């Protein structure tokens, strides 16, 4: 659950009279880990963002290593099970967002960001600028305000931690509610799909 700041030397040792100047090249967090040697073979290091109200939640999640970027909107009662299915390493939420299901998140890192990072209109503009499109209709994301808000906050955070644009993130994929068979948290754990009842990585079904 820790973050690591990676710095690179930018100054010239030959001309520097004191310590050589260094600059932050990237910040590695649980959800932005891309080093193959450190990744779990059975689990992607996914970064997720949540935004929404008591009626509807918007989710966005990104595999920074592959560039796979997805969004969805679901009812609050399905949120915990959906997070269990996706299994992100880190979740970004607004400072003012309450998480009543927080005890169920286990070891997932929760990162708070300013509320204004989740403004849906600003998020739509940032996403359009990133994808170089006039709108998000080509991705089927029109009208998904909570999901767009989450996606914008996620993209901003990912770019900030990597200190660069993310050209390999080239599309926004919309997952509609009902696309997947929903299993509650208890059922998923009892089936030992991805970890045993004792929390071990093996033996499991996947």
Name each model feature, range by range.
Residues 1-206:
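Charged catalytic and DNA/RNA-contacting regions of genome-maintenance
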